[in-house]
Amino acid sequence: MLDLYGVWRHVLLRAGIGTGKDFLAEAETYRCAGRYDRAAQALALHLTLRPGDSAAWLQLGLVQQAANASVDAEASLRKSIQIAPAVTASRIALARLLHDSGRPFCALAQYRQALLSDSNFVLDAEDVERAGPRFLDKLQNGAKYDGRIYCDISDLLAYLRENVRATGIQRVELCVIADWFRSFRHDDMIFVFCRDGQSQIYRIDDELLAALIDATSRANASVEAYRLLLTVIERESTPISLEKGDVFFILGAFWIGIDYVQTLIDLKSRGIFVGVYIYDLIPVTHSQFVPTTALQLVLGRFADILMGADFICTISDFVAREVREVLDRQFGKSIPVSSVLLAHDPPASGDGKIEPEFIDQLPPEFVLCVCTLEARKNHTLLLDVWTQLYARHGERTPVLVLVGKWGWGIEAFRQKIEEMNFLSGKIVVLGNLSDAKVDYLYRHCLFTVFPSFVEGWGLPVGESLACGKPCIASNASSLPEVGGSLVRYIDPHDCAAAAKIIEKPLMDRADLAAWTAQIVREFRPRTWNDVTDVLLDTVKSSAVAGRNSERSLDVLFAPARVYQFGSAPVQVGAGVAATLSGWEQRQNRFALRSGWHGAEDWGCWSSRPVANVEFKTELPAGTEISVLAMVRPSPPSKTGTVVLRDVAGECATTAKISAAKPAWIALKTQVGAEGKIELQIQRVDTSYRQAEPRRALFVGLSAVVYTAIEQLPALRNQIEATSLEAIG
């Protein structure tokens, strides 16, 4: 804020007095004298006359920072960048300010942009120290892919709207993104998100993403702070168009929120490679550990991704083997499946600040278990083991500290420990802890336990070892890959045997000390930098290899069979040995080639006036056929005029259809070359209004059926004998 002196000067300027004065020289004089407030006033006067002077905005930001007016300084530096984005000096000044104000990832985003805008720019020692020792490692030898990798994190954005602390998949995403910022990599990796019901992809600004990573790293992180940033990200992110040779890679939980089918179809039809990081196949192989209310949706999304992906990365060799088996048995499909193993890094300590009250409440000795409290994690075994230990050793039994939020299928366990008064205080449950607190618990426990029935990897096992602490883990699924010979293993189904293994280091402290020393001496952790490097290299190599492979989108439809496009039910509970009947129908949606939103229960809405459908038949080319499509106009119109057209043969039929219920529209045409049938469905009336503000809706398609001309009467009888509800 200007004082009376500054106000008086502005008044004179507006009156035309002093416009020829050299305010820059005056500002420099004040700056050299250490009078930063007056220097800022002089620069502000100069900018009143020349608001487009980027260098002056930079100088104003610097003197404001010297005057401890950080908020004003940041605004001035951003104004300088807005005017001249290619000038690195302003970005470097802003990076320093952001770093010194506790926003290290925002600072890294600015350093990154400075290097991208000027390939000859060299960071000085001060900035290298701020950016960190690994930031420039890949500047010279970073391998560029001749396309771009678009990394989808839609699930992470949705997750952070409801959760303060990321665990599991979302923690992996945050660690990969954070490492991507910490090491300068060329501009071939772009983070994006999708909106449900739309096939459009949106680019996330690097600095907005960095601000989100900064927010998640703070000890006082809050959902409210996340939501403010997420709202800005969703508002400011711009739609982008991917090009042939690019890669669309889904980094997170693809079954949360987003129906990717139309996005995958659109991308693959334009020569874009689709990859996905699969963390486990638990919904497929161990469906008892998935909430029944979500199981059908989750299994359907797994089917869509497995059918649509060109290549797959997995977080363990165990998951890779499962994925290959499911692809072969369920789909008769073979695509590249590569293991990109996760890290052993401990949780980031954030600012390292821990309230003394937290430390004071901890027991002097404790065993630690870090994971969501849910049925799959097998906390019931731990309760039974600690009950046995307490019965034998009484108060000598160390406390079991469970760290994690309450999840699904754990109600009986929760009720039991509450009724037992948490085993007379020998079990403690802590939730919503900062990374610094979790790190403290790891480093001060006796050892950790992780008895899970099934995992895709097992982050807590690696975190324990990385903190120099022994771990007793389940011998199931991927867990032996994480800890190797340094971990002691238990059968998650054998409580009696597990109790003996857990009791040994508790009662034999010499054994525990020797085990701990062995881990400190021998363990070599895999870092998130290693993971990110391998992941990017694998994605690039998979895309390069895919250029020479067959990537057909063709869907085979048989005559006289109704193919529906709604969210089809899938077979539940049969695991890998399930028949194709459940997932087979979901392949129908891959016939919806362009111009479609995601599937709903009844079918799909077209996203533009003309939408395409394409499938193959085993009938010879030139065979005369009738194609019937069940369609409906979009609300709120009462009627709509719809055209069904054969793209290859230029045959068309037009019908006026009531919006009250779907109706069949028929087209006589011929099978095209290579057995293809290519259709267009078009809404041609122009008087309709849109019912939804965020989606354009035109025609709804529920089903398609075709038959040879001579079989049309029989097909009509079949349709008439079947209610619309049954086939729609």
Protein language model features and the residues they cover:
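A short beta-strand element within beta-rich, extracytoplasmic domains
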Residues: 613, 619-638
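Short beta-strands within extracellular/lumenal beta-sheet-rich domains
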Residues: 598-620
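Carbohydrate transferase catalytic cores enriched for Leloir-type hexosyltransferases
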Residues: 22-28, 32, 62, 66, ...
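Helix-start (N-cap) detector for alpha-helical repeat units in TPR-like alpha-solenoids
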Residues: 20, 54-55, 88-89, 122
